[in-house]
Amino acid sequence: MEMDKMQVVWKNQKELRCGYTTGSCAAAAAKAAAAMLFSGEEVRQVSLMTPKGIELYLEVEEIQRENESVSCAIQKDSGDDPDVTNGIFVYAKITKKKEKGMTLDGGIGVGRFTRKVLEQEAGEAAINKVPRQMIREAVQSQIEKYEWDGGADVLIYIPEGVEIAKKTFNPRLGIEGGISVLGTSGIVEPMSEQALTQTIFLEMKILCEEGHRYCYLTPGNYGNDFLRQTLGYDQELAVKCSNYIGDAIDDGVRLKMDGLLLVGHIGKLVKIAAGVMNTHSRQADARMEVLAVHAAMAGADRETVCALMECFTTKEALEILEAKGLLEETMRTVMEKIEYHLTKRAGEKMKVGALMFSDELGVLGKTSLVDELRKKIG
């Protein structure tokens, strides 16, 4: 299938354009460079069949020839995905060698692993498994097509990757000096949740490989700041799970971790009391419904319940609860319900807890295993 036949997807009632991964760019650049090296002819457009079954037709840029090598670039198009790599040039340099076989390495702007991570050894270029295979197959196809009797050295480099890497999770994933060459399908789908959840899983897996069986989860910067400023924790064993609380718990179970402690602002965590495990506002809200119901259970009158339902922020709701003398009891039952849903999601194989706070009032409540989990994390 050609890219133009599958260039849009529907997300949240909007038509959004797909793009292609850094892995596809690297493989296409390698194929084009190999074709020019072994044929002696210039290639201005290259085709690439992606693992997803979509065929790309990409413009070849920045062609440079030397005696025994050719380099060129493909410009990445992320489609409508909010991606820091959109528009960068991914280069491949192919050099002939008389001996059969192929080497593949990363140059400037391609990160290197500082430790063993998944299938990658320390010191290796951060070119993931599927892109490695795509690149090798692309070059091999040209070796066979033009009947070259030797081998090839392949170098992938992304000059802009050095600066872009500073905006990514790579340093936390044990990758330094540049970005990763990524992609399992070859295609970037707009607003893909998969990339985020894979990063969360990888961070947790690295902790496990380092021997850690417990860690903190935080939905975002508020949780990280609270860990550091209020709890005095340096975040070494804290994984930012964004809105994907349920997925992060599933990851912990999958990795056979012993315990997770979720620390977050009431604006996110209160939703869990309603069983909401993806806390993005687009998925569900339920903040005021939860607070109103639990306030009613604590003895709130109809007027108070209605006032809570009219609130726009949890700060407003907390002010009402505090003024009515209902805050402590409301938070107690909210935390009980949060614990119920977290425990139900985690099952019996992993301990899980939650500590909820607000900027103005500090700690609002905690589940029964919080103190135990904090000691285990250290």
Predicted regions located by residue number:
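Hydrophobic, Leu/Ile/Phe/Ala-enriched alpha-helical segments that form helix-helix packing faces
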Residues: 33, 131, 135-146, 203, ...
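Generic N-terminal targeting/processing segments that precede catalytic cores or assembly contacts
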Residues: 2-167, 171-173, 369
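Short, amphipathic C-terminal "tail helix"
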Residues: 351-378
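Flexible, glycine-rich phosphate/dinucleotide-binding loops
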Residues: 163, 224, 363
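Residues within well-formed alpha-helices
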Residues: 25-28, 32, 247, 251, ...
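Surface-exposed flexible segments
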Residues: 89-91, 230-234, 367-374
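A structural signal for small-residue-enriched, beta-sheet-centric alpha/beta enzyme cores
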Residues: 2-10, 17, 173-179, 184-333, ...
